Amino acid sequence: MNLTQLICELTLPCADNGRDFTRTDRIHRIRDLLRSTPYTCLGEKPLVQVWQHSDFDPALPLVLVSSHIDSLYTNYHASCDDGILLGTFDNSVTNAVILSLILENSLPQQVLVAFTGDEEDESRGADQVIDILQNAPPNPIHPEMVVVLDITEESYDSHSFTFENLFRASKEAHSAQLRFEKKRDLAQFLRDLLAPSDPIIIKEGEPDESWQYDEHDLNCFAFCLPCKTITGDMHDEKGVHVKESSVHQYANTLAEVLALILGHPNMKPRGGPTPTVLP
């Protein structure tokens, strides 16, 4: 199954009431597809599932990828014509991207993947992710960076991805190996990862789940896929347009960014030297 087919297959009903999922078709399909992979469920709560690779080592630095699966549509559809996808893709398209990296074995083993609910309201799913990590046996798990996946109305005509909503952990944060003095230092860090290209960076974009992870004092940013709305509202059931070429570039860049973050010299096993403040 290629990425376009996976996007169409995952554009299924998935909704919640702020306490529990009330429509679960997409959740069940994701579970079905993950059965053939080396990933197991690290923890599950009413509004989240967190998945880990069988070789994940909690003693090593890790990155959390969070992709919300709740949506506001009543009816769902997805199609592709002449390289342009059309569908109710908030947020099935990024669900499919991260799942495709898992299925292709293109995701670093130190990446945890969370599929969350309630992003469209209070982001309680993000809070439940943190609860799972803090209570993980035998010791709490502290991500060095959180990467939130979502769609954006920015830069559809010119770019295949954007970095938005940059947040940095405070000096008092529990275990950040990557420390940034100011938000602009995190922005420069992201530019340096992909040099010499010049990515679009929007330090404060539309609210998304990254805002909630910031409440837990974590380094965080949103990695967004540009879309074009039909009616001016990405939640309208007419859907949005997404370029097929952009989706592939977005997926490739996500895999690259995750590997580069985990390979950064400051990322040391726990108990190592105090990390340097960047830049």
Regions found by a protein language model. Give the residues of each.
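A non-catalytic alpha/beta surface segment that caps or lines the substrate-entry region
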Residues: L6-P58
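A short glycine/serine-rich beta->alpha loop
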Residues: D16-N17, D81-F89, I201, H241
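Catalytic-core environment of secreted peptidases
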Residues: V50-V93, A114
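Hydrophobic/aromatic beta-strand patches that form the interior of the parallel beta-sheet core
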Residues: V63-V65, A114, M145-V147, N219-F223
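Short glycine-enriched loops at secondary-structure junctions
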Residues: S67-L72, L149-E153, P226-K228
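Acidic/histidine-rich catalytic neighborhood of metal-dependent amide-processing enzymes
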Residues: L85-R184, R191, I201-Q212
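His/Asp/Glu-rich mid-to-C-terminal helical/loop segments that flank catalytic regions of hydrolases
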Residues: L103, K228-P279
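C-terminal accessory domains and tails appended to enzymatic cores
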Residues: A176-F180, F189-L190, P196-H235, G239, ...
